[in-house]
């Protein structure tokens, strides 16, 4: 978890969760632990709530804090969405293991916060100038195909 004294650089308190934003890291070799360490050691304002790789799911920010993750300032994605970074990996088998962990996390969060597939966004939904989540888009072609992997628990 990011130290509490750094939370203000990543977002704002008292977030009301209304969605989930999916990202892929563009660092092909970094693990979830590597990315958490980078967030702690650097002064970036870009944040996320979860980082997922083939080994683990790491929660790095509390879910009642927004995080700057869509590049749109005070937009819906930054203020009301849980951000999940899925670690990219050139080894498709390892990447898919991480993606399955992320899907389990997404399904759990959907249930916890009473969300539907319509409440799941890609980073590019907020900024057409980014190709994120790039590995998901490369594998599935579009959001609809990826969302077909997710089961709603009602």
Model region roles, listed by residue range:
Residues 1-77:
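N-terminal catalytic cores of peptidoglycan-degrading enzymes
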Residues 44, 63-80, 104-113, 134-140:
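A broadly tuned preference for mixed-charge, low-complexity surface segments
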Residues 4, 8-16, 89-154:
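Basic/polar, cationic surfaces and motifs that engage anionic cell-wall
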Residues 26, 66, 80-91:
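Cell-envelope and extracellular/periplasmic
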Residues 22, 82-84, 120-122:
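Hydrophobic faces of well-ordered beta-strands that scaffold small-molecule active sites
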């Amino acid at each position: 978890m990011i130290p509490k004294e750094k939370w203000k650089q990543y977002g704002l308190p008292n977030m009301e969760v209304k969605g989930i934003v999916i990202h892929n890291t563009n660092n092909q070799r970094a693990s979830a632990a590597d990315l958490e360490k980078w967030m702690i050691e650097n002064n970036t304002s870009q944040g996320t709530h979860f980082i997922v790789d083939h080994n683990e799911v790491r929660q790095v920010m509390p879910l009642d804090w927004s995080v700057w993750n869509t590049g749109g300032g005070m937009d819906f994605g930054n203020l009301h969405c849980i951000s999940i970074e899925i670690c990219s990996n050139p080894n498709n088998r390892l990447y898919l293991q991480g993606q399955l962990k992320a899907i389990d996390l997404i399904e759990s969060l959907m249930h916890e916060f009473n969300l539907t597939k319509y409440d799941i966004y890609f980073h590019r939904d907020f900024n057409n100038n980014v190709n994120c989540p790039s590995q998901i888009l490369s594998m599935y072609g579009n959001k609809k195909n990826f969302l077909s992997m997710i089961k709603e628990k009602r």
